[in-house]
Amino acid sequence: ARRQRQMCIRDSYIYAFVQAVRTVAPWAGVPVIVLLSTTIGLIAPGFHLALIPIATASLTAVGYDDLINIWFFCCTITPGFISLAVMLRTKKPLLRQTALSCCLSALLGGISEPTTYGICYKMVKPYYAYLITALSTAVLAGLLHLKCYAFGGYSLTNILLYLGPSLDYANFRNALLLVGFMLIMSFITVNLIGFDDSCYEETAVAAADKAE
């Protein structure tokens, strides 16, 4: 119970800070929360769950969410493309197989954890590519005032949520442009930064030895 109270207090401070930033610079809310989730989130995972009601309240009040879903959009689709870039660059069969499943989980299922824990944290350098891409996308999303018209707009299968019931074609176009930006930036950053995939070779050898 004490830990839960501490987490609630932490989440309240995070939300208050993000709201204060948005008061001064409305476009900066998304990049700030992306930065917090990719830094503080490393040692305090799960704080995003407490912020979901913010999106629900925004959808009820104004008909769209321009913060929480956009944050998820940047930090879920980006890992999918990071995995795709890793899969096409590596020569390790085990990593290719892992990256493919991670890519599909993120892009089609809206689940980023396989990429985060199975690729980014394990090899470290892809995490830097992920951070650069997600943060730069968040800045653009904030400047374009990207809006999601229902909860769940953080996978390619739900991209139509950016069109909305009133057919906001400009917003939908911006969402598609940002998806393209994440794709290009993911490939550029992964290939420029590189990665050491030797750990997957060791994992494959250990698995083979265990099978014997």
Model-derived segments and spans:
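Hydrophobic alpha-helical segments of integral membrane proteins
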Residues: R10-A25, A55-L59, C103, C120
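Transmembrane alpha-helical segments and their short flanking loops
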Residues: P114-E212
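Transmembrane alpha-helix interface/packing and boundary motifs in multi-pass membrane proteins
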Residues: L35-H48, L59-G63, A106-G109, A141
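Alpha-helical membrane-inserting segments
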Residues: I14, T38, L42, G46, ...
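Membrane-interfacial loop-to-helix junctions in multi-pass transporters
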Residues: V21-V34, G63-W71, Y169-R173
